[in-house]
A protein has these predicted regions:
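Jelly-roll (double-stranded beta-helix
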Residues: 1-204
Length: 204
């Protein structure tokens, strides 16, 4: 299995401005893909929404998973009822939906090509009462996924691999796992109330 730590800097992440704030691309696959071309398999990003109301970009070829890292948001899909999203609660929707939002937030996004892959966004919120978590309980079918990333929003977060190796992630850092994950067993620990996210992608 191949592990790589991605630091939050200009080399590894790219940030672009939009009318309501800024979006930081954490990872896009296949490597070398461009979001603007709309031909990528999956994309992981975090956006800062600095306006009270905004309209989501239509992405009809993609399924989307979104979660608030800071702040709360209300979403409306296709003129339906408004849905309230608290911090660290994942929400799935069709990228082709006509989607409106209310709320200034920092969010976390996973976009997945329809018919090609599926995914999950799993929150990890540590506290004085919860200082350890195990991957097999968080993502039961983790060992069959094709790609997995751990994003640390607030750290530090310690990640212990099945071979005993330990990696510490600080705020804004990611740990990417790819390759054969059939033996993957990870333990997460934080004594500082870390907040992190597991993003996993499977073939369909």
């Amino acid at each position: 299995m191949k592990y790589s730590i991605i630091q939050k800097d200009k080399t590894n992440y790219s940030t672009s401005a939009w009318s309501g704030g800024a979006t930081t691309e954490i990872r896009i696959m296949p490597e070398g893909s461009r979001y603007a071309d709309r031909e990528f398999l999956w994309r992981l990003s975090s956006a800062t929404v600095e306006v009270e109301e905004s309209t989501f970009t239509a992405l009809p070829d993609y399924d989307r998973l979104i979660m608030m890292l800071e702040g709360e948001m209300d979403l409306c899909h296709n003129n339906g009822p408004w849905i309230h999203l608290a911090e660290f609660v994942p929400h799935a929707f069709d990228g082709g939906d006509d989607t409106l939002s209310k709320g200034k937030v920092v969010d976390f996004n996973l976009m997945l090509r329809k018919g090609k892959c599926r995914g999950a966004v799993v929150p990890m919120v540590f506290s004085a009462d919860v200082m350890e978590m195990a991957s097999e309980k968080l993502v039961p079918d983790l060992k069959s996924c094709r790609d997995c990333m751990i994003y640390c929003h607030c750290g530090p977060l310690s990640v212990k691999m099945e071979d005993g190796r330990e990696v510490e992630l600080n705020a804004g850092e990611s740990l990417q796992m790819s390759g054969d994950l059939t033996n993957a067993e990870w333990n997460f620990r934080s004594e500082n109330s870390a907040r992190a996210v597991i993003a996993a992608v499977w073939n369909v």
